[in-house]
Every structure is written in C-alpha cells, then in structure tokens.
C-alpha cells in the first residue's frame, strides 16, 4: 500500500524526474507562436516625437529641411492609431533628457505601449539635440524594466530617422524589374542626414527602427520629408490597424528600397538608394487593432 501511495504522490525513485518531463511537455504544448501583446488597455499610450531642424552653430550641422513634414505626418498617423502624441522641436540636450525622463517616470499601467521618435542627425551611438549629442542607450535605458515598471512586458518602440554612415547604397537592378520612377519637382531636392548611428541592443520588448542600415546615408527630401518616414506613414495609413507591426516594417523596407535619388546638389548621389532596418526584441505579435469605445 505504501508503494502504491508513493506512486500516487509522485515520490518513488525516478518519479520527480518523470513529473518534470511531463510538466515540460505540457508547457511546450501550451506555447502559442501566434501570441499577441495585450492591446486592450484603456489608453493606447504616449508617442513622443523629438523633431530637430536647426542646430547650434558650433556643431556645424546643416539644417534638416523637410523634417517638419515628417513630424506632421507622424503626428497624424499615430493619432489615428489612438496614441497621445507629444511633439517637441529643437530641444537642447538638457531639455530633451528632462522631457523623456518625465515620461519614463509617469504610470503607463493603463497603456498598451510606448513610442518614441527622433528626427535628427546622428553619430555612432548618439543622436543630436539642438546643442549636443545624447547617447541613445541613455534614452532607451530609462524605459527598461528596472526603471519603468509600468511598461514591463509591453512594447517599447523607438524610431530613429538619422544618417548612419558615409556610404550611398549602389543600385543593383533585378533582371525581372523595371524601375518606373515618378518625376519629381526640381524644388524637392534630396539631402542626407549627417554622420552615422550604430544598431544598439535595448532589452526585451523593445523594437528599434532605423531609417537606414548601418554604414549608409539616410535620404530626406526638402519638401516631402525623409524617404523612410514618408513610406512608414503611408504604410501606417494603409495597414497600421490591421497588419502585424514587424510585417508592416518589412513593407516599409521594400518601399524605401525601391526609391532612388533623382535631384541632389551632390552629383555623386544621383541614382543612389537606401534600405531601412529594424532590430526586434519583441516577444509577441504586435497589432494596433482599433480600440472599441
């Protein structure tokens, strides 16, 4: 009887090992590859947009003409998705750090996620504010689990529109593709954002979106705004509330890669191309389905 009783309790020799294997089996069976982030909180969340057009003269950085078109386009698209959008223009480094610290310390308990966009010049692992550069990891670090508890397990999306190198992407035309580019007005000149930005790890549930692959120029039109933000906003408008977000970003990569420089003061840039990239540390599928009121 004692032996049978032991079997029922799971204590005979080898029993604990067998139960562990069984538990592991059921855990594997319960793993859902299509699991989605919980996006039915009261609020969608905050979307910060730091827009930098002009810089302190001592930095010798050129104006980023067209960036206000990016800011307005992003504001419209993220508002449509239900975000509370907050825009800041040409902040000094100290001001920018203060604003982002304030947002990192408020409660996001009733929010789905968080978005932060930087429209600026970049260099290495830094992004430029009006008067100085700021380390990107300093900014993302404010939203890690040990600093921002209310965003633990929630998507944290950082979008960086900045140049990331000193090379243009040389176009290679696929044999089965004819590149039919639409004509553009001469007044809409293509420029590049200065310097370079590295791909940086951030942590679980972060998504780092870059306007261009590391080591290459990011192109911006002086009237319409940057290629990346134009195409990101177009895809958000068409598929933002239906398509899984990393799938949408892949479409953005394709759209931007089909562009080329037509008008530029630098003749060597004519015909050059650009491919964005993103580094996903997301652990579930991310959808921005419309909220039910």
From Swiss-Prot:
GO terms for cellular component: cytoplasm; cytosol; nucleoplasm; nucleus. GO terms for molecular function: cysteine-type endopeptidase activity; cysteine-type peptidase activity; identical protein binding. Its EC number is 3.4.22.59. A lipid is attached at residues 264, 277 (S-palmitoyl cysteine). It catalyses: Strict requirement for Asp at position P1 and has a preferred cleavage sequence of Val-Glu-His-Asp-|-. InterPro entries: Caspase-like_dom_sf, Caspase_cys_AS, Caspase_his_AS, Pept_C14, Pept_C14_caspase, Pept_C14_p10, Pept_C14_p20, Pept_C14A. During activation, the N-terminal disordered prodomain is removed by cleavage. Concomitantly, double cleavage gives rise to a large 18-kDa and a small 11-kDa subunit. The two large and two small subunits then assemble to form the active CASP6 complex. Can be cleaved and activated by different caspases, depending on the context. Cleaved and activated by caspase-8 (CASP8) and subsequently by caspase-3 (CASP3). Can also undergo autoactivation by mediating autocleavage at Asp-179 and Asp-193, while it is not able to cleave its N-terminal disordered prodomain. Phosphorylated by NUAK1; phosphorylation inhibits self-activation. Phosphorylation at Ser-257 by AMP-activated protein kinase (PRKAA1 or PRKAA2) inhibits autocleavage, preventing caspase activation, thereby preventing hepatocyte apoptosis. It is found in: Cytoplasm; Nucleus. One of its GO terms (biological process) is activation of innate immune response. Residues 125-142 are annotated as: 130's region. Residues 1-20 are annotated as: Disordered. The active site is at residues 121, 163. Changing residue 264 to S: Reduced palmitoylation, leading to increased cysteine protease activity. It comes from the Eukaryota. The keyword Transmembrane helix does not apply. Changing residue 135 to Q: Increased stability. Changing residue 163 to A/S: Catalytically inactive active-site mutant. Residues 1-23, 180-193 form a propeptide. It is an enzyme of class 3 (hydrolase). Keywords: Apoptosis, Autocatalytic cleavage, Cytoplasm, Hydrolase, Lipoprotein, Nucleus, Palmitate, Phosphoprotein, Protease, Thiol protease, Zymogen. The N-terminal disordered prodomain is required to prevent self-activation. Belongs to the peptidase C14A family. Cysteine protease that plays essential roles in programmed cell death, axonal degeneration, development and innate immunity. Acts as a non-canonical executioner caspase during apoptosis: localizes in the nucleus and cleaves the nuclear structural protein NUMA1 and lamin A/LMNA thereby inducing nuclear shrinkage and fragmentation. Lamin-A/LMNA cleavage is required for chromatin condensation and nuclear disassembly during apoptotic execution. Heterotetramer that consists of two anti-parallel arranged heterodimers, each one formed by a 18 kDa (p18) and a 11 kDa (p11) subunits. Interacts with BIRC6/bruce. Interacts with RIPK3. This is Caspase-6. It comes from Homo sapiens.
